[in-house]
């Protein structure tokens, strides 16, 4: 579609630029003609633009005609036209928000017009949408429509039914101003650039920079802009400011500013064109007459008093501030003035910069400067970079979203992403495509809840109902009878419908039907958590399972408008994601979208169009996920733009103060038009574009369906997942340039370079991450400042220090990632995939999947949804899967639930709300008994184990030592800046030149920045990580090692962490044992051995190397075998097994038939649960003996044991062959048993667990045991591990009823928690942190993953099924020895001590340098005693290497095992060493460290000042004095470093080496000249006798960098003779 005037503008601009270039050096008249040609097309657009501005401003300020003025003679303007579709604006004729009330009066006569195919009123837009016939004359039809609408409007007015409150449309999609405004501004920029080039070529005089300063004052003063907007509106203000700025730039011949603005406007034009294209494509569907019109009902206005005149600030999309408004009692949007009013980082800085520039300009005038100085101050404070960075990000992001089909109604919303603090997700947006049964109830015999559920679900999906079980009835002729549906409502809907299941005319049950959750709901919530914003979910029916994934929830029916307002008032700007479905069409949703700072609505083609939204996406959540992922990037882009603006202002101010800005007289100089402010703006522009492109390049999220597979029949599951054709995997689109490079990399010549190139690319990425440090921008600005006032070499030196720090950190990052990848690769799992015929019916394929014998062994990573896997004990489940076959199946799910006992599994569906989900297998669980086949339903990030990592809201990783150093840096930097300012001020007081004074101040401020801090932190953590890795602890996140040094509370998961998750026999008791016997007898006792032998006979023996059928069998047989070996007996070698009955949960016992020898009597041996075995036993006194038996069982259970009863009887049932013995026959005979005794089993504790717990308690650390086991088991295990015997056990149920304060208080006092869920584990860790504890969480399962991530230090124990815990952990223990945890804590303390001493060296030394420089400047000749290079040399010799040596060296000397006579003595020494380290003072960077820094700084300054004073007040040269001070400065710091680590050979060698390097630098001519540290005079006597002579003020040179320092070195050697001095005077005399 063509936009009127655009072609004219482009053609005129092109001709104007060409004529300007041809003008060359012609007369000014020709240049003026060229400018006129360039501007003429812009002037042609003045009329339409002014008209639009007037209309917009009238709407903005509420200007209307008189309420009594008739609309006669007025015709509706055309707002949009594309092809056969035309939009007429009804607002000028019917100025009220309820256009739909008179829709029928408008639509009917328009539809009767010849050539009109369809017409309807789009009430929310205030438009009449007309679709013309293909063969109709569009112009005639449009004129007739205008006449008819005008007549209808007049009739309505005369009928007196018009009320005309102030109103405006929600949005104005397709408004040509969206392109015309930035296009006009771009044309003005081109005019300004043409005028500038013409002025350069024609050598025309330029206007003073006060002209540009005045334009900048208008353009960048928020108060001034607000005043203009109140009079001209947004569009008028935008055009006026663009014209003012372009005129000022053209008159002053400034090229950089219009060039940057042209780039920015080009981005806005491309963004607006993309939005317009999307509107053209989606308008027929969005403005369709078949869509329902949302009802509009009055709501409470937020405008205040009724008499208050409502206003809004609507504008074209190009202005980026459009608000969607209907006032006068309908949907309250723009009069809700809080929308978008909260200032973001850019707005905050703009206000500061506006005030600061005014203050700077006033100061320049007061100090005696002229208007040019004041103008320079104003121009230096222009926050251009802040604006352009955000605009570039939003424009590129908006264009990218439009390219994927997302409709952005308000581009200003993209500019507000950086200030979002709350994300509200409406459950309506999480609706999937298919209906789902949420609750089922059976009402007739043969129709239980599960049967009703599966039949109703099949009917909803158009599938055949599954075959009934023997006790169920067939579903022939089943249908759903829906309850009457309610229409659209003004109250929030819940998305729930009711239906009866009718079979053969009879109602057999009822169901509640909602919708499946969108597959992108989980990625959406996970992305929302990563934004750092508060995540709030408003439920609808079916979203209850997502409660644990958000910060807070609200029940269905909660008013969304009220919720958004409250959250915005309480927490800040709100981003709302919702959808308007047909059954959700309420004004509550539309109003909430209107007032949300950013409103995102999913489009439902069957529902009303959400015109109040800022962005309308497609029908799924994929685009919403991308928008959420842009939040942190937008925030970072704005903050980066603000930092660049600050740096540009600082450098511009420095140029202004030193006068360097005035030295460039050539108007075409690159340095003149790319000043620091423009350079910062250009950098921000590129950075913003790059950030937006990074968001757009993010891969699409992986869908994670939440279908209730456990409640569906296996046949239904198989038909949905594997029954149909499976789509081929499609690779994502790869840019052409990447494909070309990839093809070239496989060429024979280039192939060897692939590996190094990939490594370099990875190193570059890692280095870029390391540069994200608060010191980086400070050092970058300092380097630029050094280049401005000092030397380029000084700037390169500073930049080199930054680069070395970043590369070193990047290398460490790559090493850690490679080690982690190697660990995970070693634990790659293989799985058997069943080969299923591809060509067959679904039912036959299912049968093949269940019974086929052909399998293929593949990597677990290659599994896809729909694959069938074969599993047996003791394999780990590789993915979430629905069971198809389960033979005596028991699964250990402790990694998910924390419950150490195996759970039984089944194939039959379970209730939809059943939390056990017995028909499912979950990734990471372990098969402990039986055999299974299952169909994969989820892999990778879609599994329950991986979701557990992000299942809890507000989980953040702990801050590293860098965060602590940032706090210290924020305290130190003001001191260094103050030192630089003091040096400058003192130099000026001593009558030094302004340039030299500022140069000295900058040198001090830059060189005193402790640039070694990031490197110290990186290397110290690297050293600690390497030492821990060598001991069996892989450090995945080295930055958390610092927290290890401060950990005071260690939380342990029990199952699989402190225990091996493997059962062992603890005791065997004869039936006659006393109930309260304590201690329990040993299994080697004769009576106990008989019980254990009988239990072993009842256990199922392994066959053909397949392993044990059950974990209890394995434990009992292992104990019996060990017992036989210890007793040196034959054991049960004579026991002959005749038949076996394996354990089944439904049966409750295992049995075996056998005899001793060949002639023995066949015996039936049973072992099983006491509640199953005891009723089958024959007791002498049933009442007393049964009570005694229960007492024994209860006593053993209180010890945390799993109890099995063992019984026997003779077998006289005939056949005893295994294949002929039926389990039912055994069950029938298993009565009148003789009770033999009891076997107690328990989870096996790791051998290192108790010593670890005891050592931690001895080191005054708090130990917390968290488990999902029964409280009795938890108490027993705690006692076994060394915790106090009287420790109280707190259950999850007790925690659930407590508020946060009571929760924290209880957690601080308790040591054992039982029956806790994964969410409660996180709550326990969080409660401990609120109490001020520094926590470590040690775990091995997915149920520990969120708590591991929440803790200050997360520690994962490597083992079966522990991938989720490893993925969330900062440190992974790679072997079974938990004792390495003590080494980790010691390393944390050692690292902290090293960092603390290194920080003392770095910061304390810099403090001393600043003090020495200030004193030297005050009492010297007005010059700093040392310069930038000298201070960098000092930092290199005293900070870089000595401080790093201290950082990587432990303060605590570890005992040498060779010094001790025995291993026990060495081990005792090691224990004492660890204890001494751990019970020492807690390391910190607070007051104690500050005292050390001050002490070192004072000592350093005193030593250097003393040496400098001796040199100054004794005969000698000025350079000799400076060298003496510099040498003393270095030696004083090295001496203090030696005292810090006098036991470390590395530190001693580094200190002595640094001293030697200093001597070498001083005595080596070339190096001494470069560094500015001249060597000692070879004739000390002559030097001491020569009087100090200083050249007069007129002879002082003002050169910088290498030249000035080389001159000073030559001068020191030449001052001994008058002849040489005269030559120096002639050579370096200042030119007149």
UniProtKB/Swiss-Prot annotation:
- InterPro entries reported in the protein's UniProt record: ATPase_P-typ_cation-transptr_C (IPR006068), ATPase_P-typ_cyto_dom_N (IPR023299), ATPase_P-typ_P_site (IPR018303), ATPase_P-typ_TM_dom_sf (IPR023298), ATPase_P-typ_transduc_dom_A_sf (IPR008250), HAD-like_sf (IPR036412), HAD_sf (IPR023214), P_typ_ATPase (IPR001757)
Alphabetical GO CC annotations of the entry are: cytosol; intracellular membrane-bounded organelle; peptidoglycan-based cell wall; plasma membrane
Q: How does it sit in the membrane?
A: Multi-pass membrane protein
Q: Which residues participate directly in catalysis?
A: 1053 (4-aspartylphosphate intermediate)
Query: Which family does the record assign?
Result: Belongs to the cation transport ATPase (P-type) (TC 3.A.3) family.
* Species whose genome carries this gene: Mycobacterium tuberculosis (strain ATCC 25618 / H37Rv)
Q: What is this protein called?
A: Probable cation-transporting ATPase I
> What are the protein's UniProt keywords?
ATP-binding, Cell membrane, Magnesium, Membrane, Metal-binding, Nucleotide-binding, Translocase, Transmembrane, Transmembrane helix
Q: Where is this region: Disordered?
A: 1573-1601
* Transmembrane stretches, start-end: 148-168, 177-197, 358-378, 637-657, 673-693, 778-798, 968-988, 997-1017, 1401-1421, 1432-1452, 1547-1567
Q: What is its main location?
A: membrane
Protein location = Cell membrane
> Could you cite one Gene Ontology molecular function of this protein?
ATP binding
Mind telling me which PANTHER family this protein's record contains?
Answer: CATION TRANSPORTING ATPASE (PTHR24093), CATION-TRANSPORTING ATPASE I-RELATED (PTHR24093:SF513)
Reaction(s) the record says it catalyses? ATP + H2O = ADP + phosphate + H(+)
């Amino acid at each position: 579609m063509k936009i009127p005037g655009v072609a004219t503008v482009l053609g005129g601009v092109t001709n104007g630029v060409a004529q300007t270039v041809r003008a060359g050096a012609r007369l000014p008249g020709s240049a003026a003609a060229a400018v006129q040609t360039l501007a003429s097309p812009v002037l042609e657009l003045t009329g339409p633009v002014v008209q639009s501005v007037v209309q917009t401003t009238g709407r903005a300020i509420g200007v209307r005609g008189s309420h009594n003025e008739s609309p006669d003679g007025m015709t509706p303007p055309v707002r949009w036209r594309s092809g056969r579709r035309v939009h007429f604006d009804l607002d000028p004729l019917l100025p009220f928000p309820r256009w739909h009330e008179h829709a029928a009066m408008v639509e009917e006569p328009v539809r009767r017009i010849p050539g009109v195919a369809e017409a309807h009123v789009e009430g929310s837009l205030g438009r009449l949408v007309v679709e013309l016939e293909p063969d109709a004359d569009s112009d005639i039809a449009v004129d007739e429509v205008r006449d008819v609408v005008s007549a209808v409007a007049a009739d309505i007015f005369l009928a007196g039914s018009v009320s005309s409150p102030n109103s405006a449309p929600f949005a104005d999609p397709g408004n040509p101003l969206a392109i015309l405004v930035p296009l006009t501004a771009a044309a003005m920029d081109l005019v300004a650039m043409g005028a500038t080039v013409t002025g350069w070529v024609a050598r025309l005089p330029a206007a003073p920079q006060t002209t540009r300063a005045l334009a900048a004052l208008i353009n960048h003063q928020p108060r001034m802009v607000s005043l203009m907007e109140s009079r001209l509106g947004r569009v008028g203000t935008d055009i006026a400011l663009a014209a003012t700025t372009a005129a000022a730039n053209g008159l002053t011949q400034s090229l950089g500013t219009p060039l940057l603005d042209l780039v920015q406007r080009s981005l806005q034009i491309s963004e607006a064109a993309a939005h317009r294209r999307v509107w053209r494509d989606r308008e027929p569907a969005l403005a369709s007459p078949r869509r329902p019109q949302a009802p509009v009902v009055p709501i409470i206005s937020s405008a205040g008093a009724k008499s208050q005149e409502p206003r809004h600030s609507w504008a074209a999309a190009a202005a980026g501030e459009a608000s969607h408004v209907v006032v006068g009692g309908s949907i309250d949007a723009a009069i809700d003035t809080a929308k978008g009013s909260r200032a973001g980082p850019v707005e905050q800085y703009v206000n500061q910069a506006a005030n600061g520039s005014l203050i700077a300009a006033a100061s320049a005038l007061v100090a005696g400067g002229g208007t040019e100085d004041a103008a320079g101050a104003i121009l230096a404070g222009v926050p251009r970079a802040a604006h352009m960075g955000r605009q570039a990000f939003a424009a590129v992001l908006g264009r990218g979203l439009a390219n994927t089909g997302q409709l952005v109604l308000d581009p200003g919303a993209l500019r507000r992403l950086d200030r979002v603090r709350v994300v509200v997700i409406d459950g309506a947006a999480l609706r999937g495509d298919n209906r789902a049964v949420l609750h089922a109830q059976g009402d007739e015999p043969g129709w239980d809840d599960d049967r009703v559920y599966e039949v109703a679900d099949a009917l909803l999906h158009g599938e055949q109902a599954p075959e009934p079980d023997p006790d169920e009835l067939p579903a022939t002729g089943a249908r759903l009878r829906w309850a009457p549906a309610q229409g659209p409502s003004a109250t929030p809907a819940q998305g729930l419908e009711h239906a009866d299941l009718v079979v053969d005319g009879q109602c057999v049950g009822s169901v509640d039907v909602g919708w499946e959750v969108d597959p992108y709901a989980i990625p959406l919530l996970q992305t929302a958590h990563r934004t750092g914003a508060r995540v709030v979910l408003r439920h609808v029916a079916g979203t209850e399972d997502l409660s644990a994934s958000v910060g807070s929830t609200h029940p269905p029916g909660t008013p969304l408008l009220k919720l958004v307002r409250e959250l915005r008032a309480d927490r800040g700007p709100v981003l709302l994601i919702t959808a308007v479905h047909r059954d959700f069409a309420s004004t509550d949703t539309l109003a909430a979208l209107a007032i949300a700072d950013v409103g995102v609505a999913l489009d439902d083609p069957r529902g009303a169009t959400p015109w109040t939204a800022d962005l309308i996406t497609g029908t799924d959540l994929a685009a919403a996920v991308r928008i959420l992922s842009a939040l942190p990037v937008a925030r970072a882009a704005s903050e980066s733009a603000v930092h660049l603006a600050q740096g540009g202002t600082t450098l511009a101010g420095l140029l202004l103060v030193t006068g360097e800005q005035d030295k460039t007289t050539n108007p075409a100089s690159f340095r003149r038009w790319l000043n620091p402010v423009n350079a910062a703006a250009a950098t921000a522009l590129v950075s913003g574009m790059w950030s937006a492109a990074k968001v757009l390049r993010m891969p699409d999220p992986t869908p994670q369906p939440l279908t209730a597979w456990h409640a569906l029949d296996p046949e239904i599951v198989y038909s949905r997942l594997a029954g149909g054709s499976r789509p081929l995997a499609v690779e994502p689109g790869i840019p052409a340039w990447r494909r070309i490079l990839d093809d070239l990399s496989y060429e024979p010549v280039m192939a060897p370079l692939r590996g190094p190139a990939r490594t370099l690319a990875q190193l570059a990425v890692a280095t870029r991450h390391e540069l994200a440090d608060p010191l980086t921008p400070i050092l970058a600005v300092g380097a630029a400042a050094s280049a401005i006032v000092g030397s380029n070499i000084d700037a390169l030196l500073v930049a080199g220090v930054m680069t070395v720090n970043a590369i070193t950190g990047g290398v460490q990052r790559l090493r850690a990632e490679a080690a982690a990848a190697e660990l995970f690769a070693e634990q790659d799992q293989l799985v058997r995939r069943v080969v299923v015929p591809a060509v067959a019916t679904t039912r036959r394929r299912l049968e093949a999947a269940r019974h086929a014998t052909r399998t293929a062994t593949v990597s677990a990573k290659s599994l896809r949804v729909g694959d069938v896997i074969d599993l047996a004990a003791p394999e780990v489940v590789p993915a979430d899967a629905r069971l198809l076959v389960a033979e005596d199946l028991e699964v250990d799910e402790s990694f998910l639930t924390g419950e150490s006992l195996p759970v039984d599994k089944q194939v039959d569906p379970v209730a939809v709300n059943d939390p056990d989900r017995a028909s499912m297998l979950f990734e990471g669980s372990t098969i402990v008994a039986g055999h299974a086949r299952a169909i994969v339903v989820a892999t990778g990030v879609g599994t329950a184990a991986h979701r557990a990592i992000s299942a809890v809201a507000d989980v953040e990783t702990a801050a590293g030592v860098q965060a602590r150093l940032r706090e210290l840096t924020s305290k130190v930097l003001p001191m260094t800046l103050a030192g630089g300012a003091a040096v400058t001020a003192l130099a000026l007081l001593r009558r030094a030149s302004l340039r030299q004074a500022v140069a000295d101040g900058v040198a001090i401020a830059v060189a005193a920045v402790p640039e070694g801090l990031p490197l110290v932190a990186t290397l110290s953590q690297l050293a600690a990580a390497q030492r821990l890795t060598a001991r069996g602890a892989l450090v995945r996140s080295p930055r958390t090692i610092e927290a290890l040094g401060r950990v005071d509370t260690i939380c342990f998961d029990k199952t699989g962490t402190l225990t091996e998750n493997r059962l062992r026999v603890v005791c065997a008791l004869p039936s006659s044992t006393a109930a309260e016997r304590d201690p329990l007898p040993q299994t080697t006792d004769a009576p106990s051995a008989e019980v254990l032998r009988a239990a072993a006979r009842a256990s199922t023996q392994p066959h053909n190397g397949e392993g044990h059928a059950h974990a209890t069998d394995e434990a009992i047989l292992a104990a019996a075998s060990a017992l036989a070996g210890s007793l040196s007996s034959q054991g049960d070698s004579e026991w002959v097994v005749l038949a076996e009955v394996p354990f089944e949960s439904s049966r409750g016992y295992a049995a075996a038939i056998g005899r001793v020898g060949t002639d023995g009597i066949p015996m039936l041996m049973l072992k099983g649960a006491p509640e199953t075995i005891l009723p089958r036993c024959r007791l002498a006194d049933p009442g007393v003996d049964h009570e005694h038996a229960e007492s024994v069982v209860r006593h053993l259970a209180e010890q945390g044991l799993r109890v099995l009863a063992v019984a026997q009887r003779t077998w006289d049932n005939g056949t005893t062959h295994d294949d002929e013995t039926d389990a039912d026959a055994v069950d029938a005979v298993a009565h009148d048993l003789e009770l033999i005794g009891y076997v107690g089993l328990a989870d096996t504790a790791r051998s290192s667990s108790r010593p670890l717990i005891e050592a931690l308690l001895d080191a005054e650390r708090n130990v917390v045991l968290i488990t999902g086991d029964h409280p009795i088991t938890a108490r027993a295990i705690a006692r076994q591990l060394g915790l106090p015997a009287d420790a109280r056990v707190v259950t999850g149920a007790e925690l659930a009823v407590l508020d946060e304060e009571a929760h924290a208080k209880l957690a601080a006092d308790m040591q054992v928690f039982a029956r806790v869920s994964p969410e409660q584990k996180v709550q326990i860790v969080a409660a401990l942190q609120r109490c001020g504890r520094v926590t470590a969480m040690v775990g091995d399962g997915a149920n520990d993953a969120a708590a591991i991530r929440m803790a200050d230090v997360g520690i994962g124990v490597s083992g079966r099924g522990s991938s989720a815990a490893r993925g969330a952990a900062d440190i992974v223990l790679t072997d079974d020895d938990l004792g390495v945890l003590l080494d980790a804590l010691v390393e944390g303390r050692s690292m902290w001590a090293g960092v603390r001493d290194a920080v003392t060296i770095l910061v304390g030394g810099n403090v001393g340098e600043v003090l020495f420089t200030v004193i030297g400047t005050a009492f010297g000749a007005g010059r700093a005693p040392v310069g930038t290079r000298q201070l960098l040399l000092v930092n290199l010799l005293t900070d870089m290497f000595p401080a790093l040596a201290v950082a990587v060296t432990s303060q605590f000397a570890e005992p040498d095992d060779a010094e001790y006579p025995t291993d026990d003595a060495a081990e005792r020494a090691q224990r004492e060493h660890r204890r001494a380290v751990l019970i020492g003072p807690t390391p910190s960077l607070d007051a104690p460290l500050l005292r050390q820094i001050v002490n070192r700084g004072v000592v350093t300054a005193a030593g250097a000042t003393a040496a400098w004073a001796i040199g100054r007040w004794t005969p000698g040269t000025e350079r000799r004095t400076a060298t003496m001070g510099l040498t003393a400065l270095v030696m004083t710091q090295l001496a203090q470093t030696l005292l810090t680590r006098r036991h470390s050979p590395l530190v001693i060698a580094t200190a002595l080496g640094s001293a030697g390097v200093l001597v070498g630098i001083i005595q080596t001519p070339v190096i001494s000249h470069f560094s500015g540290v001249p060597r000692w005079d070879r004739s000390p006597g002559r030097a001491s006798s020569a009087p100090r002579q200083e050249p007069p003020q007129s002879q002082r040179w003002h050169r910088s960098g290498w030249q000035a320092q080389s001159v000073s070195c030559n001068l020191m050697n030449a001052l001994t003779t008058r002849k040489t001095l005269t030559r120096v005077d002639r050579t370096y005399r200042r030119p007149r």
